[in-house]
Amino acid sequence: MSKAIPKTMKAAVIDKFGGPAVLHVARVPVPEPGEREILVRVHAAGIGSWDPWVREGGMGGTRFPQVIGSDGSGTVVAAGSKVRRFKVGDRVYAYAMDNPKGGFYAEYAAVPEDGAGLAPAGLSLDEAGGLAACGLTAVAGLDALKIAKDAPVMVLGASGGVGHIMLQLAKREGARVLAVASGRDGAALAEGLGADLAVNGKTADVAKAVRGFAPEGLAAALVFANGDKLAPALKLVRKGGTIAYPEGVEPVPRGTAGVKVRSFNGLSGPEAFERLNGLVSLGTFRVEICRTYRLDDLPQAHRDVLKHHLGKLIVKPRA
């Protein structure tokens, strides 16, 4: 590696699986990029609701200390000999779930070339830091639905990390979107992002809102948050329609007879990043950054990510 790249870096690590308190800041070696990997000087890392699951041992593994952090953004400072898509100096965002060389809760991250994309020109690196995992999951949701122009679609959880991105992508696909968000602030966010109708799922009669929005029934529903209160609204997806949800949503949504229910996972690979970038570039796009943390704040961030918040939480390792 270049002499300008240090041998060690500051990172938030875990030495064992457990609660938020196992996260602590330490100095660890800067990872060496392999021949098909890039080394990223991290600007920001997303904090996802799945990160506490990883911290608790959900992905397994026995190598400690372990750096987690499933996605992030930054600048390429070194590239392996067989890397063709990136060069030193490129602004990138990347996905690092289950990456053997560690995640983005660090000053540097080495990731496979195919797990990264050029940061969209219209986004800041703060926004790009929270985009990869949620954006690639949202694109998978589009594929699960195959949304038709002017189709009435409901997004449940429209103010969350994946949901607020899904709302914007669905509008780009030409859908009419009913956004069910968390709280008055969530409904205001969804309205500001272009929802045709935004309601507060905590207080609104969601089924009544659906009947007014789509008298003949919904063509589809994307479920990023669920609960017994929302079940009547899901029954208003019409015959031939689709309910889609990312794996991990509980309780699993159910539809009526003739409605397809599909689960999906986030996409990966160069084509997925290119598709997401293409959708983002179609107009004004926003990754809502709710709060920004430092590395030593991550135990609290892991508590906060499981509570009410809008959009994304991020950590800036160099703050």
Language model features with spans:
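C-terminal hydrophobic helical "lid"/dimerization subdomain
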Residues: 2-7, 273-319
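Glycine-rich beta-strand-centered segment in the early N-terminal region that forms part
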Residues: 29-46, 56-98
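NAD(P)H dinucleotide-binding glycine-rich loop of Rossmann-like/cofactor-binding domains
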Residues: 85, 95-157
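Residue-level marker of beta-strand positions
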Residues: 90-91, 108, 152, 172, ...
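Mid-domain Rossmann-like dinucleotide-binding core that forms the NAD(H)/NADP(H) cofactor-binding site
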Residues: 129-203
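Glycine-rich cofactor phosphate-binding loops and adjacent beta1-alpha1 units
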Residues: 188-262
